[in-house]
Amino acid sequence: MHNLIPNVQKTMEQSFIAYIENSIKNNWDLDALTDYKGATLQYKDVARKIEKLHIIFEESGIRKGDKIAVCGRNSSHWGVTFLATLTYGAVIVPILHEFKADNVHNIVNHSEAKLLLVGDMVWENLNESAMPLLEGILMMNDFTLLVSRSERPVSYTHLTLPTIRL
């Protein structure tokens, strides 16, 4: 019976990714995520941003099962980061943006996250030296590199993605 568990998990993971992929394909030109009084991302925009994050994760050495922390206000980019992390096969570590900096540091350290994506309001209160296990910290709204402790590049703000044909 215990041999079924990995197969069930793999099937559920594949189903989730297929569900996201099909949603994007079937709604390509429709609105997907909107910030309150802000920009709206269509499904095609979400797909391109997910692809960009996947490239950043790969180039950063993130592997399936690695942890990626995210701490910022609810936004379309928070949603994109969440979807990109899960579809990449990494584990998302969501942290409430209302937490005090010490609590954020403790959660990041305890989770053994390799990357942290933060919102600008959160970043101004954090101390990167209090999170020594992180390999990189990126700004959530545009994926720019804030801190890198790796020889690997972790941000590609200049990256232009190819046109995705679905």
What are these regions (language model features)?
Residues 59-60, 87-153:
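Structural core segment of the AMP-binding/adenylate-forming
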Residues 10, 36, 71, 116-119:
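Active-site-adjacent beta-strand anchor residues
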Residues 21, 29-83, 100-105:
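Conserved AMP-binding/adenylate-forming core of the ANL superfamily
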